[in-house]
């Protein structure tokens, strides 16, 4: 989830180009510089030293969606954002943001100009939690929030106004500082996968990719190990535990059935067919009508006839 932000978007590169910054420019202001030279000027509607901080309501977005909104930065990003009240007449800010919330950590730090004991700003550290409070999941996104110390935060003249601060200044960064690298690697993998040709196979009118087709073709192959396992299941009782005796597992991948039919090799079926067919017809007629004329002795006599006896002598013993 945290890696969902687009890194180095074209919009941000265009914004950096429009700033006309000198080569090698780095923006790493101190807490005092952020409050005195940027936040105080922003609230007083005075021009900034460099228009390098974007105006974004970061409480409407997840932190991993914010880097692409910034005007400058690779590992840390700066924003001016308004703050709303949690309750209509209260002084606490609403920390819900995107699909989670920001939670304060540590003590507030006063910010004062060098050589002065007068506090001009307050620095607060916050951690983003994904999900609903109080059971959100802690992430690696950190925010330093700077607000003016003497700002008038009384409820505004407009009835029902939720505005707590017109502007506060925020510095955002990821604690592990590796999310940008991971996102770039994911983009490379996705681009390679999109450019790779895909072979398709058809089965029952449905289109499948090559990987699915290979998996399907493997499912129709029976290996020696599969047959051995099936034979072992029979030896140990199989599904019901009743057992089927010992079964010798084949080793060549095929099930061989031994045929004990050598006894009829060389027999002349032309000699066997007439008496067999004659006695079969005789037996059928006798069973249908045992009292029919010409069938004295019935079924017992038919099976003791010379033709049937000859047939019985050539039948194999069971």
UniProtKB/Swiss-Prot annotation:
Gene3D superfamilies referenced in this protein's UniProt entry, alphabetically: NAC domain (2.170.150.80)
GO terms, molecular function: DNA binding
PANTHER family in UniProt: NAC DOMAIN-CONTAINING PROTEIN 68, NAC TRANSCRIPTION FACTOR 56
Residue intervals of the NAC domain: 21-175
Protein name: NAC domain-containing protein 68
InterPro entries, per the entry: NAC-dom, NAC_dom_sf
Keywords from the UniProt entry: DNA-binding, Nucleus, Stress response, Transcription, Transcription regulation
Chief place of localization: nucleus
GO biological process: regulation of DNA-templated transcription
Compartments reported by the entry: Nucleus
């Amino acid at each position: 989830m945290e890696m969902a932000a687009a890194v180095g978007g074209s919009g941000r590169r265009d914004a950096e180009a429009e700033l006309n910054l000198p080569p090698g420019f780095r923006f790493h202001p101190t807490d005092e510089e952020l409050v005195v030279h940027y936040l105080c000027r922003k609230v007083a509607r005075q021009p900034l030293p460099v228009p390098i901080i974007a105006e974004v309501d970061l409480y409407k977005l997840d932190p991993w969606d914010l880097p692409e909104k910034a005007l400058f930065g690779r590992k840390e990003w700066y924003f001016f954002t308004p703050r709303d009240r949690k309750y209509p007449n209260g002084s606490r800010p609403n920390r819900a943001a995107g699909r989670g919330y920001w939670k304060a950590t540590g003590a507030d730090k006063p910010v004062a100009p060098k050589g002065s004991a007068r506090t001009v700003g307050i620095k607060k550290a916050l951690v983003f939690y994904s999900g609903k409070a109080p059971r959100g999941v802690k992430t690696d996104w950190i925010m330093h929030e700077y607000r003016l110390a003497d700002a008038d935060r009384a409820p505004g003249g407009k009835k029902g106004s939720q505005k707590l601060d017109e502007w506060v200044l925020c510095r955002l960064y990821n604690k592990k500082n590796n999310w940008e690298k991971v996102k770039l690697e994911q983009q490379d993998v996705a681009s390679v996968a999109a450019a790779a040709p895909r072979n398709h196979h058809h089965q029952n009118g449905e289109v499948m990719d090559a990987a699915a087709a290979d998996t399907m073709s493997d499912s129709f192959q029976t290996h020696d190990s599969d047959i051995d396992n099936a034979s072992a299941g029979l030896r140990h009782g199989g599904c019901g535990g009743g057992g089927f005796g010992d079964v010798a597992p084949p080793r060549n991948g095929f099930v061989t059935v031994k045929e004990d039919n050598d006894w009829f090799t060389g027999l002349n079926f032309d000699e066997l067919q007439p008496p067999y067919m004659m006695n079969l017809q005789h037996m059928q007629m006798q069973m249908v009508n045992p009292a029919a004329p010409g069938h004295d002795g019935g079924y017992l006599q038919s099976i003791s006839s010379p033709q049937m006896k000859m047939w019985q002598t050539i039948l194999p013993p069971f």
